[in-house]
């Protein structure tokens, strides 16, 4: 009878050991943490939004619509450090004085969030960009020797 008790005790011990292993194997750890998607900085988000060919929707100078800019397009190239870049403009009206508002290409330095760009000609542009629109506003100062009618506040509304 002692052998039978020993076998029973061994069986119970083995069963308890297996149950303990199953319990502890499924404990702890919890859910694996979900990797959060990195949040883009304002500059990085704006750089992605600006990376399009933009076509003119409307242009105004001192609140007056300027129809001669129909066909104007703009493309920005943002440097990898997001501190500046280049722009290329096409469809600039044939009038020589219109080239004083935009040159066909140039460079710029950028604010930390890419909402203010300072062109290489010294013009400071304010940008408001979304997936579907870009508004570029700037002032051409009279003191720069620009031709009358091309100074003042300009607003270029663009679409991709």
Task: Give the residues covered by each predicted segment.
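Bacterial N-terminal signal peptides that target proteins for export
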Residues: 2-14
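C-terminal motif of bacterial Sec signal peptides marking the signal peptidase cleavage site
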Residues: 23-26
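Lipid interaction determinants
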Residues: 28-103, 111-160
